[in-house]
Curated annotation (Swiss-Prot):
Catalytically driven reaction(s): (2S,6S)-2,6-diaminopimelate = meso-2,6-diaminopimelate
Keywords attached to this entry: Amino-acid biosynthesis, Cytoplasm, Isomerase, Lysine biosynthesis
Subunit structure: Homodimer.
EC number: 5.1.1.7
Source taxonomy: Bacteria, Bacillati, Bacillota, Clostridia, Peptostreptococcales
Organism: Alkaliphilus oremlandii (strain OhILAs)
Subcellular location: Cytoplasm
Residues at the catalytic site: 74, 223
Function per UniProt: Catalyzes the stereoinversion of LL-2,6-diaminopimelate (L,L-DAP) to meso-diaminopimelate (meso-DAP), a precursor of L-lysine and an essential component of the bacterial peptidoglycan.
Keyword match Cytoplasm: yes
Official protein name in the record: Diaminopimelate epimerase
Length: 280
């Protein structure tokens, strides 16, 4: 069957967007994600976004990693999703709510000259609760603790931003090392559901650089929940202020920490192409 899709990207993190009405086979969505996201035999993307109606919010987003696994939340993905539903006329207002497996997220569309310039998302707060992340620990938190993988020690902090994240501060962002150690940390025994891995370089109080190895997707050019988690941890440790620019390989993301403690992420969302994918 032919599946109508749109391909989008947010700071280099790319996604395929499909309306559920165009593929109403929930039991086959994981298989669709694997096939359509394949960069050699499919369209190619980091993940699949499904547009669904919601009974508790204005609309619902379901997200599948490129390996077919389900993720509760995707920061760059929800920006692309929000631009899609706004541009396609699903919602007429610039502020709306999106249901995710990580709860309801509040969205603000930012336009310039009649086109969507960027999207702001209320990401909520990170949790350090080891049971909710989850991570195996004798304490109720996992902050600045040592683990050893591949013969090398790392000081890590584990949090959840709807999905599990590890934050590692480093003086140098070495892509070769990130791609080697990333999957080893992702699958470390202390993470029963695996984890995303973020290598973070602090530039100054207002700027950091983040490189992410994503659970279920591998190395990506950006990770919204990872960037948000990195700022939250850096702020908690006194390394950055409340308004931080995050440099990722695919561009820049702005993270603001409000008085409530909620983290707001703002970044671009752009169309790449649209078409029909033959699925069998």
């Amino acid at each position: 069957m032919d599946v109508q899709f749109k391909k989008m990207q947010g700071t280099g993190n790319d996604f395929i967007v499909v309306k559920y009405d165009d593929f109403p086979f929930e039991e086959k969505l994981s298989q669709l994600a694997e096939k359509i996201c394949d960069r050699h035999f499919g369209i190619g993307a980091d993940g699949l976004l499904i547009v669904n109606p919601s009974s508790i919010a204005d609309i619902r987003m379901d997200y599948y990693n490129s390996d077919g696994s389900i993720a509760a939340m995707c920061g760059n993905g929800i920006r692309c999703f929000s631009k899609f539903v706004f541009d396609e006329g699903f919602l007429r207002t610039k502020q709306f709510s999106v249901e995710t497996l990580d709860g309801i997220k509040e969205i603000a569309i930012i336009e310039e000259k009649g086109t969507v310039k960027s999207v702001e998302v209320n990401m909520g707060q990170v949790t350090y609760d080891t049971e909710k992340i989850p991570v195996v620990s004798e304490d109720g938190y996992f902050i600045n603790k040592k683990i050893t993988v591949g013969g090398q020690d790392f000081i890590i902090t584990a949090v959840s931003m709807g999905v599990p994240h590890v934050i590692i501060f480093t003086e140098k962002l070495d892509l070769e090392q990130i791609k080697f150690f990333g999957p080893l940390i992702e699958k470390h025994a202390i993470f029963p559901k695996k984890t995303n891995v973020n290598f973070v370089h602090r530039i100054d109080k207002d700027n950091i650089a983040v490189r992410t190895w994503e659970r279920g997707a591998g190395y990506t050019l950006a990770c919204g929940t990872g960037s948000t988690s990195a700022v939250a941890v850096a702020n908690k440790l006194g390394l950055v202020n409340n308004n931080v620019n995050v440099e990722v390989e695919g561009g820049n993301i702005k993270i603001k920490i409000k008085e409530s403690g909620n983290l707001f992420m703002e970044g671009p969302a752009e169309n790449i192409c649209s078409g029909r994918f033959f699925f069998n």
